[in-house]
């Protein structure tokens, strides 16, 4: 078995008709493949869009709504209908499914993050198939994860999956838009995600979904940095899921970081919300970036913002003003400033176990998406 624990993400276009309504036939194609993989011993998680698509018709809308309240109402109806389809299909093969609705707050709060990961682990151990979506009905727009590509990568990293498969209506990442550029070539293997890759992914996706190729590259970055390989491939092939599970998919494969980030480091890098800014001198910058040491109070050159003990802050170079990383502090801002003024600034401010350096890939996530 090439990959045992796999997260599959299906977009709205992969489970709907051209008019945006839910396609039971497409869902059956996906669940049939999931059932075969499950019976072969794989541990599976499905991140599925489509709640709005499943619900807008039932509420009398002629087409997919645009207003936030209309979309949230459609999602409230559609999520139940969507789960009904998945549950009916999987239960006919003797498989228990579970619904989990997540929001950005479930990742930003460390305890909720750990609880979600624990629940998913139990479900997988008990051979259930978790079906995950963002909690669209109650999510505030500015506090949303925003797309299920990103959500699937966050889930894959959280549960230390062996593979993330992003299923779409496009069979991978191309050097240009294959619909308008006959010279566009698919990239079958991507070892590093950089500005050039992001530029290639700049086009928009299907009219019915929100996850274009750019969000898939963002997802691939999160997963690959966490040590999870990623496939982007078409859901239209009848055996797409099985082929991906055996590393034979017809799509684009993203090579993971050789030593993926541990769960604590993932949380710091991708989900923790920075409560302040700390500037450090050249000696501290070298100790953090080159030697993997803790940040000492004596290396702090300046503090901005108000934060408490064990809050996350972003650390910057005083010389270049560039971000060096993020960490959880052992002193609140008021106490730290008092110590600095008294010239008695001794001890550890951020322990190296609570520190993550900003790699080029993480910097791309912070600046490009």
UniProtKB/Swiss-Prot annotation:
Q: What InterPro entries would the database entry show?
A: AceGlu_kinase-like_sf (IPR036393), Asp/Glu/Uridylate_kinase (IPR001048), G5K_ProB (IPR041739), Glu/AcGlu_kinase (IPR001057), Glu_5kinase (IPR011529), Glu_5kinase/COase_Synthase (IPR005715), Glutamate_5-kinase_CS (IPR019797), PUA (IPR002478)
Q: Which residues bind ATP?
A: 9, 168-169, 210-216
Name the domain of life: Bacteria
What does the record give as EC number?
A: 2.7.2.11
**Gene3D superfamilies, alphabetically?**
Acetylglutamate kinase-like (3.40.1160.10), PUA domain (2.30.130.10)
Pathway(s) per entry = Amino-acid biosynthesis; L-proline biosynthesis; L-glutamate 5-semialdehyde from L-glutamate: step 1/2
Which reaction(s) does its UniProt entry say it catalyses? L-glutamate + ATP = L-glutamyl 5-phosphate + ADP
Record's signal peptide: none
Q: Give the PUA domain ranges.
A: 275-355
Q: Report the locations given in the UniProt record.
A: Cytoplasm
Q: Which GO terms describe its molecular function?
A: ATP binding; glutamate 5-kinase activity; RNA binding
User: One Pfam family from the UniProt entry?
Assistant: AA_kinase
Which SMART domains does the UniProt record give?
PUA (SM00359)
Q: Which CDD domains match?
A: AAK_G5K_ProB, PUA_G5K
An example GO BP is: L-proline biosynthetic process
User: Which UniProt keywords are given for this protein, alphabetically ordered?
Assistant: Amino-acid biosynthesis, ATP-binding, Cytoplasm, Kinase, Nucleotide-binding, Proline biosynthesis, Transferase
Binding-site residues for substrate, renumbered to this chain? 49, 136, 148
Recorded GO cellular component terms are: cytosol
Q: What does this protein do?
A: Catalyzes the transfer of a phosphate group to glutamate to form L-glutamate 5-phosphate.
Please state which protein family the record places this protein in: Belongs to the glutamate 5-kinase family.
From the Swiss-Prot or TrEMBL record, give the protein name.
Answer: Glutamate 5-kinase
What organism does the record attribute this protein to? Neisseria meningitidis serogroup C / serotype 2a (strain ATCC 700532 / DSM 15464 / FAM18)
């Amino acid at each position: 078995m090439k990959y045992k624990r796999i997260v599959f993400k299906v977009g709205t276009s992969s489970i709907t008709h051209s008019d945006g309504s839910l396609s039971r036939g497409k869902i059956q194609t996906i669940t049939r493949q999931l059932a075969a993989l499950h019976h072969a011993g794989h541990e599976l998680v499905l991140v599925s869009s489509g709640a709005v698509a499943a619900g807008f018709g039932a509420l009398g809308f002629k087409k997919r709504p645009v207003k936030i309240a209309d979309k949230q109402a459609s999602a409230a109806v559609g999520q139940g209908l969507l789960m009904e389809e998945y549950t009916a299909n999987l239960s006919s093969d003797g498989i228990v499914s579970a619904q989990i609705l997540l929001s950005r707050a479930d990742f930003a709060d460390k305890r909720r993050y750990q609880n979600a990961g624990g629940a998913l682990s139990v479900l997988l151990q008990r051979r259930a198939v978790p079906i995950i979506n963002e909690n669209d009905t109650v999510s505030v727009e500015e506090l949303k994860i925003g797309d299920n590509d990103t959500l699937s990568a966050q889930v894959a990293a959280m549960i230390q999956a062996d593979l993330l498969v992003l299923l779409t209506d496009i069979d991978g990442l191309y050097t240009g838009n294959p619909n308008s550029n006959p010279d566009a070539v698919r990239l079958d293997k991507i070892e590093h995600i950089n500005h050039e890759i992001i530029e290639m992914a700049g086009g928009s996706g299907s009219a019915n979904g929100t996850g274009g190729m750019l969000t898939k590259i963002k997802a691939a970055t999160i997963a690959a940095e966490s040590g999870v390989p990623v496939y982007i491939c078409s859901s239209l092939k009848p055996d797409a899921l099985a082929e991906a599970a055996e590393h034979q998919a017809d799509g684009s494969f993203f090579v993971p970081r050789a030593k993926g980030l541990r769960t604590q480091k993932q949380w710091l890098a991708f989900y923790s919300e920075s409560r302040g800014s700390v500037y450090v001198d050249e000696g501290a910058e070298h100790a953090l970036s080159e030697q993997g040491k803790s940040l000492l109070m004596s290396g702090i050159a300046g503090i901005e913002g108000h934060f408490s003990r064990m809050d996350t802050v972003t650390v910057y170079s005083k010389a270049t003003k560039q971000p060096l990383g993020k960490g959880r502090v052992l002193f609140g801002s008021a106490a730290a400033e008092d110590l600095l003024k008294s010239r008695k600034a001794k001890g550890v401010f951020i322990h190296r176990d609570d520190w993550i350096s900003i790699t080029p890939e993480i910097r791309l996530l912070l600046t490009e998406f």
